[in-house]
């Protein structure tokens, strides 16, 4: 399995930086005043293969299966610097060994990001997000996310694919339990709260050992799948997008969320993963989001059956 990052996450974060909510300016969590210069110097040293590698996520060996499996021997790729991030790595020993390999044997010594679906707790398990939302208590949601971040980061996981902030109004959809329900206002409050819980109140809080990157998913209208069938198409107007489905994502962005995830569905016949409207016009130009975007599980590969790419190589372009 692999997810392809639309922007090189590992490269950016390995030099201790973050994207601010402004347009075009970068901020270092550690206060580094020369961060753009340092990033440019690393980029100048990278081969095309290394750049592509840093934009690619593989799955660590795990008993957890959440989609199609691609069995890949990651160690040779790791030594070449061709892995930007790993999914499903939850063992502190395995994470340490992987990171040591990347830092000792890859040419540019770029650390690996370790990601996991920390949805409603890591070791300590909390109520599912839908149940938690019934309390109408944003502070409680923030506290549970903060505890989960502390536990996950303690073993080396530094990126969670949460919160899921999809508005869902059809109980037949199989992922209603992962979000906050049908109300955009409540969804927005809890979206921002969970981002603060995972990441902290300020950008520099991500330097803390008990915080991790959050990811607002799935952009957008994934919960509006027709007939509640997962991965199905959606039929929503731009007004519905802006009034109902966008607000929790905008709240996450305003709370400083570091990453966004694409959605499997299509909107107006265009797969979200390849939507210029969503990711350039709205996310980048309108909202001025300068973080990075990750595709959902094999979503780029699925652009082929969507009919917008002739093959997987074309889809990756």
Regions found by a protein language model. Give the residues of each.
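Glycoside hydrolase catalytic-domain context in secreted enzymes
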Residues: 19-317
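Bacterial Sec-dependent N-terminal signal peptides
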Residues: 1-28
């Amino acid at each position: 399995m692999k997810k392809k990052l639309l922007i090189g996450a590992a490269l950016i974060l390995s030099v201790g930086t973050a994207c601010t909510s402004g347009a075009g300016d970068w901020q270092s969590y550690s206060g580094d005043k020369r961060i753009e210069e340092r990033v440019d110097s690393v980029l100048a040293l990278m081969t095309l293969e290394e750049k592509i590698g840093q934009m690619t996520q593989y799955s660590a060996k795990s008993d957890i299966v959440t989609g199609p499996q691609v069995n890949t021997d990651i160690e040779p790729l790791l030594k070449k610097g061709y892995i930007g991030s790993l999914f499903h790595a939850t063992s502190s020993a395995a994470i340490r060994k992987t990171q040591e390999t990347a830092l000792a044997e890859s040419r540019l010594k770029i650390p690996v990001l370790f990601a996991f679906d920390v949805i409603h707790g890591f070791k300590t398990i909390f109520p599912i997000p839908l149940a938690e939302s019934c309390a109408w208590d944003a502070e409680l949601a923030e506290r549970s996310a903060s505890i989960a971040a502390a536990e996950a980061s303690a073993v080396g996981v530094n990126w969670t694919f949460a919160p899921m902030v999809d508005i869902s109004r059809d109980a037949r959809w199989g992922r209603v339990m992962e979000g906050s329900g049908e109300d955009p206002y409540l969804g927005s409050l809890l979206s921002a709260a969970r981002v603060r819980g995972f990441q902290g109140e300020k950008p520099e809080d991500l330097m803390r050992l008990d915080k991790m990157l959050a990811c607002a998913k799935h952009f957008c209208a994934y919960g509006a799948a027709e007939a509640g069938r997962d991965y199905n198409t959606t039929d929503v107007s731009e007004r519905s997008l802006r009034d109902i489905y966008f607000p929790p994502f905008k709240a996450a962005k305003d709370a400083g969320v570091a990453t966004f995830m694409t959605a499997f569905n299509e909107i107006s016949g265009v797969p979200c993963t390849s939507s210029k409207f969503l990711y350039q016009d709205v996310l980048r130009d309108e909202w001025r989001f300068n973080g990075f975007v990750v595709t959902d599980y094999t979503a780029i590969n699925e652009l082929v059956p969507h009919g917008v790419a002739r093959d997987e190589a074309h889809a990756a372009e």
